[in-house]
Amino acid sequence: METLTFEFPAGAPARGRALAGCVGSGDLEVLLEPAAGGALSIEVVTSVNGSGPRWQQLFARVFAAATAPAAAIRIHDFGATPGVVRLRLEQALEEAGHD
């Protein structure tokens, strides 16, 4: 198990909390909570050691397209593919943007 942390610039705080996915399914879960301070912090707990560069590249692509909300994101990963990671992350961001 490896724990990775990342930080990106962000805009206004996320509107609410969100949960996407289920780590028990052999996939991953994304937990998102609003945060103050114009920063998006991400903590990844993964079963795949040495995967830091892959996560960094994936997050850089996702957050280059649009300004992320200020939030604290925790990801519990059990070897999900980059496509599934992006899907779950986008689901959590969308859910957190709703009232």
Swiss-Prot record:
Covalently binds the prosthetic group of malonate decarboxylase. One of its GO terms (cellular component) is cytoplasm. The modification O-(phosphoribosyl dephospho-coenzyme A)serine is found at residue 25. It is found in: Cytoplasm. One of its GO terms (molecular function) is acyl carrier activity. Signal peptide: none annotated. Coiled coil: none annotated. It comes from the Bacteria. Keywords: Cytoplasm, Phosphoprotein. Belongs to the MdcC family. Subunit of malonate decarboxylase, it is an acyl carrier protein to which acetyl and malonyl thioester residues are bound via a 2'-(5''-phosphoribosyl)-3'-dephospho-CoA prosthetic group and turn over during the catalytic mechanism. This is Malonate decarboxylase acyl carrier protein.
